[in-house]
């Protein structure tokens, strides 16, 4: 008897970021980790979920530049991160770390 092959496709978090709450929870979890490459990639995931072209336009950046900056290999300037956060309708908050 031949086994049926199960077809799979890569999991894309951007497909699951449907609500503001989903997006906020995802970004908060990534920020807690503190890995700058992961934070950039997460912003890229969120931008893709919202529409990269629209986010690039609202941030005043080129679409290709934004893709590159927010890729796992990207290293965006902090100013770029702030522009993207604003374009996404998000803000950055700081709280004291417990030591």
Predicted segment positions?
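Long, contiguous binding/interaction regions
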Residues: 32, 60, 97-99
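Alpha-solenoid HEAT/Armadillo repeat architecture
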Residues: 32, 48, 71-74
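N-terminal flexible/basic segments that precede or flank functional cores
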Residues: 1-42
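Short alpha-helical DNA-recognition segment
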Residues: 48-68
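Extended, folded domain segments that form the structural surfaces/walls around functional sites
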Residues: 26, 31, 66-68, 79
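DNA major-groove recognition helix of helix-turn-helix/homeodomain DNA-binding modules
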Residues: 78-95
């Amino acid at each position: 008897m031949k086994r049926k092959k199960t077809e799979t496709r890569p999991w894309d978090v951007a497909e699951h970021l449907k609500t503001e709450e989903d997006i906020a929870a995802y970004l908060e979890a990534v920020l807690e980790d503190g890995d700058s490459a992961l934070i950039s990639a997460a912003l890229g995931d969120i931008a893709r979920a919202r529409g990269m072209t629209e986010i690039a336009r609202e941030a005043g950046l080129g679409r290709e530049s934004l893709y590159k900056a927010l890729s796992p290999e990207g290293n965006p300037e902090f100013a770029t991160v702030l522009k993207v956060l604003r374009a996404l309708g998000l803000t950055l908050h700081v709280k004291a770390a417990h030591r």
